[in-house]
Amino acid sequence: MKVYAAPFEKFVNLADARLGTRILSVTDDWFADANRLFQPTPAVWKEGVFDDNGKWMDGWESRRKRFEGYDSAVIRLGVAGTIKGVDIDTSFFTGNFPPSASLEACFLASGEPDENTAWTEVLPSVELQGNSHHYHEINNDQAFSHLRFNIYPDGGVARLRVYGVPHRDWSKVSADEQIDLVAALNGGRSIACSDEHYGSMSNILNPGRGVNMGDGWETARRRTPGNDWVIVALGHKGEVEKVIVDTLHFKGNYPDSCSIQGALVKGGTDSQIETQSLFWRELLPSQKLTMHAEHEFAEQIKAIGPITHIRLNVFPDGGVSRLRVLGKVAR
């Protein structure tokens, strides 16, 4: 099992480039493009690589400041949401990292921030070290759509991860509209799995199809009896009508078969839910899978009523690129 550096790492990274997160404005990114902050892959070091502005760095890096002030970047999150925690990652920035940083946020139903926008401080100034991860829990139940990331006074940051719960106005979803109940953009999140040796369990809920094997969930080769599994919390309680299991890019390492269980969970912690999931009702009986393909199951879905969680079982192990659970919202 993967060991998380902070409990909130299991939540959706709202600042993931794959969700559409992007820089709206930045005071200075002379040495390194600020949009690199949102790349889903870990930062890398390229020895001896320089461009016209200096040493190539995998992150956001501003010039050395020769006047008063500090640098900042205004960010539009790919999906608005409630922030549970952040990771300010200064990997490979050693003599050029900012001594401190802070984070502000706002929520706009439409449009972009301007000079009249009221910002809320969600992370007061915190000290930073070079080549390090800095995990900070955020205690604020508001939903935010934009961030202002401040570094004092200048320097470089490799990655900014903003973990939280995506926000969606479910009152605007009609009773007869079929939606993906587990999509990250709709608030779905992977909460536990048996193993994620090669790829994160959260990848299977991302929009679009996977770009490669690394952009999916893949377990280690199982050398003991049993099977691998992942538990997903739906963005909203709903009734399932169709499931899509996509093994794109997985050719010699796709699962032989899969099944899905579901449950209407009321209360409990993630660890308690994990323990109980073995006894959930069968939503999708065991189905054969093939390599590098989308598998749609509709007629095979059992009518078990409204559910809040599903458990995808893969037999015996292997990789899945994406999981879609289509259905209607249950009020």
UniProtKB/Swiss-Prot annotation:
One of its GO terms (molecular function) is allantoicase activity. One of its GO terms (biological process) is allantoin catabolic process. Pathway: Nitrogen metabolism; (S)-allantoin degradation; (S)-ureidoglycolate from allantoate (aminidohydrolase route): step 1/1. The keyword Hydrolase applies. It comes from the Bacteria. The keyword Hydrolase applies. Keywords: Hydrolase, Purine metabolism. Its EC number is 3.5.3.4. It is an enzyme of class 3 (hydrolase). It catalyses: allantoate + H2O = (S)-ureidoglycolate + urea. Belongs to the allantoicase family. NCBIfam families: allantoicase (TIGR02961). This is Probable allantoicase. It comes from Pseudomonas syringae pv. syringae (strain B728a). The lineage of its organism: Bacteria, Pseudomonadati, Pseudomonadota, Gammaproteobacteria, Pseudomonadales.
